[in-house]
């Protein structure tokens, strides 16, 4: 059992090393897009299922509250938090529409959708992306494995941050690190700090 625990740490470290080689440019581009969105008076909507729903909420909380520096709140909404809305849509329509219907109501041109799925094949996240595209929103997709069907929906103006792993747990671990990198870049671009602080 101890070896298995050590192996999990080793695999996680190696996946992060691989991600550090593969992902910085796409993370920087996504952060730049998010800064542009926020400076334009727009907002970021985030969605995912299970652990990815938690990641969407984590990202939203970091923007609405703060990440590491004191700053004004930034507009972000996790679409996975309103149980009344989610269960009403799932009951009356389909679970695949729990995010897309919210995007049709809340999304505006210039907003960004942060779409999170370790497989890239979550039906409701794909529907959310389709809704975002119809609302002239930009998409930042956090994926893993081969990018799944989500990768095929992205256009030149969108960004995919695909973790180089096929293991769901390792992908989720890197997704959290990517979210922290995005928050750090957003904060330091919008609110430059003296590095001495």
From Swiss-Prot:
Keywords: Carbohydrate metabolism, Cytoplasm, Isomerase, Metal-binding, Zinc. Pathway: Carbohydrate biosynthesis; D-glycero-D-manno-heptose 7-phosphate biosynthesis; D-glycero-alpha-D-manno-heptose 7-phosphate and D-glycero-beta-D-manno-heptose 7-phosphate from sedoheptulose 7-phosphate: step 1/1. This is Phosphoheptose isomerase. InterPro entries: GmhA/DiaA, Phosphoheptose_Isoase, SIS_dom, SIS_dom_sf, SIS_GmhA/DiaA_subfam. Its cofactor is Zn(2+). Its main location: cytoplasm. Its EC number is 5.3.1.28. It catalyses: 2 D-sedoheptulose 7-phosphate = D-glycero-alpha-D-manno-heptose 7-phosphate + D-glycero-beta-D-manno-heptose 7-phosphate. PROSITE patterns: SIS. Belongs to the SIS family. GmhA subfamily. The reaction produces a racemic mixture of D-glycero-alpha-D-manno-heptose 7-phosphate and D-glycero-beta-D-manno-heptose 7-phosphate. CDD domains: SIS_GmhA. Residues 34-196 form the SIS domain. It is found in: Cytoplasm. GO terms for molecular function: carbohydrate derivative binding; D-sedoheptulose 7-phosphate isomerase activity; zinc ion binding. The keyword Transport does not apply. It comes from Shewanella baltica (strain OS155 / ATCC BAA-1091). Binds 1 zinc ion per subunit. GO terms for cellular component: cytoplasm. The gene is gmhA.
């Amino acid at each position: 059992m101890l070896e298995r625990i050590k192996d999990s740490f080793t695999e996680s470290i190696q996946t992060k090393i691989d991600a550090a080689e593969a992902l910085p440019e796409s993370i920087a581009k996504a952060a730049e897009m998010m800064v542009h969105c926020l400076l334009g008076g727009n907002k970021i909507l985030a969605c995912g299922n299970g652990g990815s729903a938690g990641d969407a909420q984590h990202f939203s909380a970091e923007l609405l509250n703060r990440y590491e520096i004191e700053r004004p709140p930034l507009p972000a909404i996790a679409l996975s938090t309103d149980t009344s809305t989610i269960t009403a849509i799932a009951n009356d329509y389909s679970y695949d529409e729990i995010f897309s219907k919210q995007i049709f109501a809340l999304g505006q041109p210039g907003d960004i959708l942060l779409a999170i799925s370790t497989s890239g094949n979550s039906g409701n996240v794909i529907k959310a992306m389709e809704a975002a595209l119809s609302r002239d929103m930009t998409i930042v997709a956090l994926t893993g494995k081969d990018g799944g069907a989500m990768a095929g929906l992205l256009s030149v103006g969108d960004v995919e941050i695909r973790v180089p792993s096929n293991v769901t747990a390792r992908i989720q671990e890197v997704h959290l690190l990517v979210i922290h990198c995005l928050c750090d870049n957003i904060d330091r671009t919008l609110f430059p700090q003296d590095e001495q602080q």
